[in-house]
Each structure stands twice: as structure tokens, then as C-alpha cells.
Amino acid sequence: MTRLAIGKPAPLGAHYDGQGVNFTLFSAHAERVELCVFDANGQEHRYDLPGHSGDIWHGYLPDARPGLRYGYRVHGPWQPAEGHRFNPAKLLIDPCARQIDGEFKDNPLLHAGHNEPDYRDNAAIAPKCVVVVDHYDWEDDAPPRTPWGSTIIYEAHVKGLTYLHPEIPVEIRGTYKALGHPVMINYLKQLGITALELLPVAQFASEPRLQRMGLSNYWGYNPVAMFALHPAYACSPETALDEFRDAIKALHKAGIEVILDIVLNHSAELDLDGPLFSLRGIDNRSYYWIREDGDYHNWTGCGNTLNLSHPAVVDYASACLRYWVETCHVDGFRFDLAAVMGRTPEFRQDAPLFTAIQNCPVLSQVKLIAEPWDIAPGGYQVGNFPPLFAEWNDHFRDAARRFWLHYDLPLGAFAGRFAASSDVFKRNGRLPSAAINLVTAHDGFTLRDCVCFNHKHNEANGEENRDGTNNNYSNNHGKEGLGGSLDLVERRRDSIHALLTTLLLSQGTPMLLAGDEHGHSQHGNNNAYCQDNQLTWLDWSQASSGLTAFTAALIHLRKRIPALVENRWWEEGDGNVRWLNRYAQPLSTDEWQNGPKQLQILLSDRFLIAINATLEVTEIVLPAGEWHAIPPFAGEDNPVITAVWQGPAHGLCVFQR
């Protein structure tokens, strides 16, 4: 058998140098590592990796070329109680592979065994890694670097956003190419979006349970190869990387940033009954948080938790993030269940991965957004992330819904959330933009469903409606489901307008869920993670042009208000904000806590948001000055109105003087 040259211990992964390929793999507890390469006929050829530098195994294969398919067999102890689950009968994915050939199907051969090892060889059906070469012309691409204070985030799914768009060519709908199509870019520009936040695009697998039910993982929060693009979103798997970069380059030319939702908290190997794809067989003890009995700490709800305090795993995660920035020019990340990033195992702001990101000249310069919780004790960490991070602000989400849909939130609590939740985020030198304000997200009801359903309707997910949260703070306005009388439709529309206005004219960084701006419904499903169908795909033919125009007008209005774009905390007397009652007087302490839900918010001394969240039409006395309603609450040409606004029940209006 041909022997490999020793090669180099860095960088991790498979790298072509023009003459051959250098292979490197981390494993602190392996006793032997075999590189397995497959020829055009599928014949397997095995080579021991001869180099062993610290915990890095490496070797160099002369004359190997891009397109070569490979995997690893890793030898070591099978000692489940100690956290070791080596099984050389199983072909393993390189954690740093840039492309994968094959599908991650539910098959007993892709399991290592629970208590006893399964020594049946699986190379015939296991997915293979592919060696790639990177040559791409970025031309004059430059990151937009939109200031945080001017950032408007649009959360979208690659397929769901584009698959049904009638003006995008059929052959590219649902793909990376569609994201860069002029029709999509023009839509985002007209809406006023500055950052497109994509649900996971790194390669993921559908859980075996879903496959057995005929479903699939649609959202993508089940990663299997963090350096590889999910091939189902590409017109051709071989060109996925260039298709993705073409889209990013086109978006950048339009001034739109691209933020990736990335999953560093767990892997698709799930619990001990889950499949064996990669990390579990390479070095289970190092990659995962292991309990004393050898099982996993399940702090993610997905069966396992990556140990992001282990030095090698920190290096792996950091290299992954740098890859997406340096190779694909992404502008930032949203981190799923990001409290795991700070676990040591207790949560710490100076956890190793946070420190590595802070000290990295590449990663410290991009937008970083945390979903600031996990499901373990002490996992709720909203407001506690390091200064470089912004965070999803669930306080804002719940407050906005309670104020407009449940009518049970005092004015003081509403104002606190409107002012970027300063009680939560104004610390450690952080700015208002650290609060990522949202009313909806991929996880939960859509905006339309918030006003049409009191209860979740997740039966299609196959769990007898047990999955998904029951704490929705929604209001169906008297009838469960879509449709209804003209009066019902109008009341729901008014609530949608109120929630959108609160989101887009409050301090902090707004995030809009794709489809909310044109009335997309998931028919009451608030956990549509496994619905790759018309329930989740945006139906552009049914889009409400009126609601889209309303949303766009709000976004463009936001950009005109200095108090919202200057990204500095509001202080009493600084001219940024004044809080007034229905008589244009400062609110008393009692009004803040117990007063009627009527409020006037004067921003930058020129823009006035008048709110009447009561059940009755109410006269609102505006502050001194000549006020006129402005779009989207009135047409462009409006006469100066009187000093009093007749506020409709559960209504609001924006004025300018």
C-alpha cells in the first residue's frame, strides 16, 4: 500500500496545494487514524495518517486532486462509561469538509451502537467528503458595514423566501442564486432592508424520527458539516459555493449585508441512540459535554451539547466562523442557543470562545447576534453577553404582544421596552443596538397568526400538538383561524399595524420576519421546523401589497428619525425623547403604573407617536405646534391638522411638525 508523506498539522481539513492534498484531523484520544479515499468506481483505499503532532493527526497524499472523495476511520477504545465511542467500522465525515457527497439517510448502518458497538461496515452507504479547490473572483466586493444604528434585519429561509416567487426563473427558485436575483434584491431595497439574516445554510441532516414520518428538517438547525454549504439550496452541488458567493456579491453591491444563522451548540448526532456521522466517532470525549455516566449533557434539547470550552473545539468553532467571513464574505452571525458558547460549564462572559472571538481581528469586526439562552439551569442569559454581541430581545417581543393583544402591560413596562430595554442592555459599554427587537421570528407564530389564533395548531408535525410553545400572547380577535367578517379583518389589520409600528419605530435594532410584511400565515403552526411545503414557503401571489407598502413606509420613516439611528442611550432632557400623557403632559408615577393605555412619544422633538391602546375612541391632545400625519398613516400631502387627534380604539398614528 502507498504510504502518505507526513505532511503538516495545519490547517485542519483537506487542502490542495497544486501537487497533492494535505489531510489533518484532531483527536486527543484516538490510537490510530485511517484516511479512506474512494476512486471513481467507489473502491476504497486506506492510508494510515503518519503524522501525529500533539492531538493533530496528519498526512500528505501526493498527486491527489480536487474532487477526491474521502472519509476517516478512527481507532480507539470503546468505553461508553468513559465517553469513548471509537468504531473503525464506521466511515466518518471530516468536521472541516467543504463539500459532502451523499445523503444522511436513516439507516441502522449509520449508527455506532448504544451500549455495544456495531461492527458492520458502512462505507458503501456513508456520505463522503469531497476535496475542493477555491478560486473565486470577488472583483471589487466590499462589505457594506452598515452602522448598527441604521441596521434593519430581515430573517428569511433560502428556499421559503424564493421558491414561489413568480418573477424569479423557475430553475433557480429556492436556491442561493435566487437570493442574488435582481427581483429579490430590488424587493429588499424597496422594503428598506439593510441585512438579510439567513436560517442555517451549513449542511444539515433530517432527524431519523422525521424521516420515518415522511417529514424533513426544514429550518436546518441540525448541523452535520459546518464548513459545507447545504447542497439542496444549490442548482448544482459542485457549484454551491460559487452560487452562494455570487449571491453575496450581488447583495453587497446593493448595500445589503448577509448574516448567517449558525449552530455551534449541538450536532446532528443527537443522543446516544442517534446516528454516527463524525464527531462522536472522532473524539466523543473532547467534542461534547459528557456526564459522569458517559451520557451527554443535553443543554440544547437536541440530545447533545458541544463543549465549546475545550481548546480544540474552540479552535474548530473559530476556524469555522473565520471560514465563512474570509471565504464567503458574510457580514455577521446569529448564534443559535448561544448560551452554550459561554458554558464552562457555568455561563461566563470570559468563556474561551467569547475570548477567542473578541481577540480575533476578523471575527471582532463583524456583526454578532446571540440567541441568549439554552435549556439548562442558568441558561437564560439575556443581557449578559460580552459587549461585542447584540442579543435577541424576548422582553420586547412579549411586551409588544401583551400591550397590543392582551392589554395587560403598564405604560412604564411598555416604554422600557420601547427604549431598547435599557434596564437589560445598558451595561458594559453596550449601545441600544445590542437589543435586537422582534415581534416574531422563524420560531413561533407569524405576525398574521398572532392576530388570528389563540392556540397553536401543530398537528402536522406529528407530535399530537405537544410541540411548540403555549405562551404566544396572541389574540384571534374573537374567531380562531383565518378569514371572517369585514370588521374582524379590519381589527386584525389594525393590530398588525400597531405591532409593526412598535417594532420599527422603537429604539434598538429591529428584526422583521420574512413574510410578515405581506401577511404570510402558517395556519397556526408555531413550530414549523419540519414543514418544507406551502405552509412555510412565502406565497407571493397572495401577498398584501397594502401591508408591504405600510411596512416599507415605516422603515423609511425610521431612517429619518435621529433618535432612532444615532444609537445612543436616551437621557432626560437630551431632546431625543419625551413621554407624554393624553393631555401632552409628562406622565405621573401613577399614570406610568396604573394609568389608561394612552401615550404620546415625542422623538427628536419633531416626530410624535400617539397611542390609544384602550377599548374606546379617545381624544388625544397633541403638544404645541402644527402637526400633520405622515406616511404610512396619511398621504404625502396633508394639511395641518387641529391640535387634537381622535384616537380610535387600539389605534396609533405618527405625526410630524
Swiss-Prot record:
- Is Hydrolase included in the keywords of this UniProt record? yes
**Molecular function terms, GO-annotated:** glycogen debranching enzyme activity; hydrolase activity, hydrolyzing O-glycosyl compounds
**Is Transport found in the keyword set?**
no
Q: Which Pfam families match?
A: Alpha-amylase, CBM_48, GlgX_C
The organism's place on the tree of life at top rank: Bacteria
Catalytic residues (UniProt):
336, 371
Q: Provide the E.C. number(s) assigned to this enzyme.
A: 3.2.1.196
* Gene Ontology biological process terms, A to Z: glycogen catabolic process
Q: Which SMART domains match?
A: Aamy (SM00642)
| InterPro entries registered for this protein in UniProt | GlgX_C, GlgX_Isoamylase_N_E_set, Glyco_hydro_13_cat_dom, Glyco_hydro_13_N, Glyco_hydro_b, Glycogen_debranch_bac, Glycogen_debranch_GlgX, Glycoside_hydrolase_SF
Which pathway or pathways does this protein act in? Glycan degradation; glycogen degradation
Where are the residues of the annotated region Disordered?
Answer: 458-479
* Residue numbers marked as site, Transition state stabilizer: 443
Identify the stretch annotated as signal peptide in this record: none
Q: Which regions are flagged for Basic and acidic residues bias? A: 458-467
Query: Which UniProt key words apply to this protein?
Result: Carbohydrate metabolism, Glycogen metabolism, Glycosidase, Hydrolase
Which transformation does this protein catalyse, written as a reaction? Hydrolysis of (1->6)-alpha-D-glucosidic linkages to branches with degrees of polymerization of three or four glucose residues in limit dextrin
Record-stated family: Belongs to the glycosyl hydrolase 13 family.
Q: Which HAMAP family match?
A: GlgX (MF_01248)
Q: What does this protein do?
A: Removes maltotriose and maltotetraose chains that are attached by 1,6-alpha-linkage to the limit dextrin main chain, generating a debranched limit dextrin.
Protein name as it appears in the record:
Glycogen debranching enzyme
Biological source species: Escherichia coli (strain SE11)
